[in-house]
C-alpha cells in the first residue's frame, strides 16, 4: 500500500527535461511514493529556443527512466502550466529545488500560478548528490566531450553520445 499525503491523488511535474537527469528522476520517484498519480509533462516552449532533444525523444527518455513506476504518466504541453494542471485534474504542481536560487524563481512562479488558478505548488528538495545537476550543464559537458554518465540514465548518455560523440573522459 502506497503512503499518500491526505487524499491527494494527482500531481503535475512540468519541465523541459532537455535532457532528463538523475535529479529529475529522484523528484519523480518521491512524488510517485507520495501520490497516486504523477503526470510528468514536457513543455514545448518556443521562447527557450530549439531544444537539443525533440519532444518525442524527451518523452521516450522519460518513459525509459520511469518504467519502474506504475503510477507515472507522460504528456506534453505548450499552454500555461495551470491550464494543463486543470486538464489533468492535478491537486498540486510539484517542483524540485536544488539550491536557494531555485527557490527564488520557483516561488515567484508558484505564487503567480496560485493567483491565476488556485493551484498550489509543492516543493521537493533534491538530495545533496543531485543539487549540482542541471540539464543545461549536462548538455555543455557532453558537447565538450565530458562524461555525464553518473548524472543521467544510460539511455540519455547514449543519445547524448550520438548527438555529440563519445565522451573523451575530459
Q: Which residues does each PLM region occupy?
A:
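Nucleotidyltransferase catalytic core that binds NTPs
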Residues: 2-170
Amino acid at each position: 500500500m502506497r503512503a499518500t499525503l491526505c487524499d491527494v491523488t494527482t500531481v503535475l511535474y512540468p519541465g523541459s527535461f532537455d535532457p532528463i537527469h538523475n535529479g529529475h528522476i529522484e523528484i519523480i520517484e518521491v512524488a510517485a511514493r507520495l501520490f497516486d498519480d504523477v503526470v510528468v509533462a514536457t513543455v514545448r516552449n518556443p521562447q527557450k529556443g530549439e531544444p537539443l532533444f525533440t519532444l518525442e525523444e524527451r518523452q521516450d527518455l522519460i518513459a525509459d527512466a520511469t518504467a519502474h513506476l506504475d503510477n507515472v504518466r507522460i504528456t506534453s504541453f505548450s499552454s500555461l502550466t495551470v491550464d494543463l494542471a486543470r486538464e489533468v485534474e492535478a491537486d498540486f504542481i510539484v517542483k524540485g529545488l536544488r539550491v536557494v536560487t531555485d527557490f527564488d524563481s520557483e516561488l515567484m512562479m508558484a505564487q503567480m500560478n496560485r493567483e491565476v488558478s488556485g493551484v498550489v505548488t509543492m516543493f521537493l528538495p533534491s538530495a545533496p548528490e543531485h543539487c549540482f545537476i542541471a540539464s543545461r550543464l549536462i548538455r555543455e559537458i557532453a558537447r565538450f566531450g565530458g562524461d555525464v554518465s553518473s548524472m543521467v540514465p544510460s539511455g540519455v548518455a547514449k543519445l547524448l553520445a550520438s548527438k555529440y560523440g563519445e565522451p573523451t573522459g575530459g
